[in-house]
Amino acid sequence: METFQCLTLFLLFISTVFILKRKFSHKPNLPPSPPKLPILGNFHQLGTLVHRAVTVLAAKYGPLMLLHFGKTPVLIVSSQETAKEIMKTHDLALANRPLTTAARALLYDCTDISFAPYGEYWREMKKMAVLNLLSIKKIQSFRSVREELASDMIKEITRLSKTGAPVDVTNMLYHFSEDLLFRCTLGFKPKGQHKFQKLSRDFLDLVGAFCFNDFFPGMAWMDALTGLNRKLKKGSRELDDFVDELIEERIAMVKDGVEPNEFLDLLLHTHRDTTQEIKLTRDNVKAIILDTFLGGIDLPASVMEWAMAELMRNPSKMKIAQEEVRKVVGNKNKVDEDDVYQMNFLKSAVKETLRLHPPAPLLFARESYTSINVENYIIPPYTSVMINIWHIQRDPKLWDKAEEFIPERFMNSGIDYKSHDYEFIPFGSGRRGCPGMSFGVAAVEFAVANLLYWFDWKFVGDTTPETLDMTEDYCFALFKKKPLHFIPISRSS
């Protein structure tokens, strides 16, 4: 009897404590969330075009929305004001990236620049890349390389135009972008360059692939069953072999008397210099070079492709752009970069392309390392944060006729690539903003100017501006799903 009374009192005590705890415990005020499934969270609501899916959800749940991908909380920011608060007020607290399984496997444990954790190593590597590859002064020094490679592209298109057959414009622009990045980074075109297009697309597919280990760590064994682990090992080995080969190729060139003045040479010198505070391993060198290739080739090429697609879809805008380019260049036998500075409509067309088709529509995710307060909501530590610039840059509250291609909106507007109002931020902002912005824009403007100056362009078959396929393909970055094929008509003919 006494035992029963003690047990009853104990249970009453526990129940009272539980009730009081429930009553007085303070749950953090989290942002609104769509209903989620047990374990899965909100995965089932995403689809293949994530930026479009979260835009639909945000219309219902608000511009600050918390999703759950398995165990991972993901904050989606879909308004100009909140994006500004996130990237300005909380820039330091969100200076890290989520370290995914694929990024670790393919980028030497995230010792590149894009994914490296915020800290001294990241700061020094970013500074080295900016000073020796991505600064305005260095970009201007690559002028002759851009002009030479654009001339090569024009000669090849001219040769093909004589047959009257369609030209794969997508492929032409990709190889211009690829040749440019290799020449500016390495000083030469590597022998195995032809392999890289497939390697880079495989990389993007793998980084964007679903990984159990990232979202359901207890089910990491499933990555072996799905084949992801095997693909990551294969992709890592192929990328490593590729970068190793070009490093050895460059070392041999320097031994034969070539001046070691390129970005790769600087990285190798830093690797060999034991007096440096930041010690670079050979794997670190490979990670940084690979990161430079992956960000500096595919993404500018994609913007060039979207720009040509939009101009072809909008013949009146194409006419204005071509007239401007041809008036500025005149009867010279080449387009030079001094000309491009005067092409205000062309520059505005590139901005308008980036407004409608940002290469990273959700930017690249950041991660909170501490709890932060955004609009009176608590964002817990280790939350992934994605800025939905695809929606912000199409928000009808910010842009008149937001879905239309209207380059004139940027003419004399004062809106540049570092918009202080955050309505136009295709390259992000703050510490994790894209350091290669100026390099990429210079390449895009120059390539498109050359295509418009030297050729008129016709659709293939019965394709019209209204029927041109503009379907998107989202694999970590935003690409056009179907390559562009147009018929070039050389002005010289």
Swiss-Prot record:
Cofactor: heme
GO cellular component terms, semicolon-separated: membrane
Cellular localisation: Membrane
GO molecular function annotations of the record: heme binding; iron ion binding; monooxygenase activity; oxidoreductase activity, acting on paired donors, with incorporation or reduction of molecular oxygen
Bilayer-crossing regions: 1-21
Uses in industry and biotechnology: Combinatorially expression of Sinopodophyllum hexandrum (mayapple) genes of the podophyllotoxin pathway (e.g. DIR, PLR, SDH, CYP719A23, OMT3, CYP71CU1, OMT1, 2-ODD, CYP71BE54 and CYP82D61) in Nicotiana benthamiana (tobacco) results in the production of the chemotherapeutic compound etoposide.
Enzyme Commission number(s): 1.14.14.131
Main location class: membrane
Source organism, top-level taxon: Eukaryota
Residues annotated for heme binding in this entry: C434
SUPFAM superfamilies for the chain: Cytochrome P450
Its membrane topology: Single-pass membrane protein
Reactions catalysed, as given in the entry: (-)-bursehernin + reduced [NADPH--hemoprotein reductase] + O2 = (-)-5'-demethylyatein + oxidized [NADPH--hemoprotein reductase] + H2O + H(+)
Keywords for this protein: Heme, Iron, Membrane, Metal-binding, Monooxygenase, Oxidoreductase, Transmembrane, Transmembrane helix
Record pathway: Aromatic compound metabolism; phenylpropanoid biosynthesis
Protein purpose: Cytochrome P450 involved in the biosynthesis of etoposide, a chemotherapeutic compound of the topoisomerase inhibitor family. Catalyzes the conversion of bursehernin to demethylyatein.
Family, per entry: Belongs to the cytochrome P450 family.
Name of the protein: Desmethylyatein synthase
Native source organism of the sequence: Sinopodophyllum hexandrum (Himalayan may apple)
Source organism phylogeny: Eukaryota, Viridiplantae, Streptophyta, Embryophyta, Tracheophyta
